[in-house]
């Protein structure tokens, strides 16, 4: 485990994920999959339920190596969480399932998500002003939300949370984000929908400037300064950091409409998990 020494103990806990109908709106190649942002809520829930002192608003070294599918008939998705507690009190949590080999004799562990939670309190609110979209740099290319969710990120209504127009430039992207609705939990670490929509922004940027349809597979650090809430509006900014090869690397900032920062993410990793089966439409590259 990176930056953690003196591991104290590892425990396994059964976890039941309630498969709310809105989760069926998040899918890949026709199969509903649990979004990374929802998985982070589950990881945080397991952590504080067993170690209440954990700072779940400081998340590090997250990875999402494989999708966790949700069948339409499922009401409860059963998984398990492995929690490793370090000597300093910090935690790492893994969500996994068991898969049997074709022989039906041997089972193996399939990891779906991993994150490390810090022990220390989150950093002080940074004095990071909300930049004007006109100052992104480079020629702007605007995409209506309707076109995004029709052709670029074709998810169902619950996960259509970019509002208005997305502005893209070689130096970044900015969009207004919606806090979402429905049964999603916004108490622990905030609503999952603004961050999910910010990742859609990164996906759109990758389609225009890198020519691939990339999904999030991890991040280096996420700091939650304030919790986003459902039914509220935010502004998301994506900054490309390293796009010379996969995974594409981005940083992200989420503000409210008054310019107050709510979240920052660094080292977001985006990869074409379809292995080229999904391709951007030609129009997204117009004018390049």
Kindly label every feature range from the protein language model.
Residues 1-288:
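Acyl-thioester-processing domains in fatty-acid/polyketide/NRPS systems
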């Amino acid at each position: 485990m990176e930056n953690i020494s003196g591991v104290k103990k590892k425990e396994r806990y059964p976890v039941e994920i309630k498969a709310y109908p809105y989760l069926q709106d998040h899918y890949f190649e026709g199969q509903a999959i649990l979004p990374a942002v929802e998985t982070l809520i589950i990881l945080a829930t397991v952590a504080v339920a067993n170690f209440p002192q954990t700072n779940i608003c400081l998340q590090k070294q997250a990875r999402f190596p494989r999708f966790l599918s949700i069948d339409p008939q499922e009401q409860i998705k059963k998984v398990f969480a492995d929690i490793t507690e370090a000597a300093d009190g910090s935690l790492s949590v893994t969500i996994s399932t068991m898969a049997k080999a074709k022989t039906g004799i041997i089972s193996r562990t399939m990891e779906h998500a991993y994150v490390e939670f810090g022990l220390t309190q989150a950093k002080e609110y940074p004095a990071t002003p909300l930049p004007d979209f006109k100052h992104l740099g480079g020629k702007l290319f605007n995409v209506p939300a309707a076109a995004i969710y029709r052709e670029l990120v074709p998810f169902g209504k619950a996960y259509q949370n970019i509002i208005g127009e997305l502005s893209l430039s070689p130096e970044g992207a900015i969009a207004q984000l919606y806090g979402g609705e429905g049964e999603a939990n916004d108490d622990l670490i905030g609503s999952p929908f603004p961050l999910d929509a910010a990742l859609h922004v990164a996906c759109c940027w990758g389609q225009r400037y890198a020519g691939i349809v990339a999904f999030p597979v991890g991040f280096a650090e996420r700091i939650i300064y304030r919790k986003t809430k459902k039914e509220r509006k935010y502004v998301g900014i994506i900054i490309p950091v390293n796009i010379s090869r996969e995974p594409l690397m981005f940083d992200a900032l989420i503000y409210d409409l008054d310019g107050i920062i709510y979240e920052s993410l660094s080292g977001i990793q985006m990869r074409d998990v379809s292995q080229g089966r999904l391709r951007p439409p030609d129009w997204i590259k117009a004018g390049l």
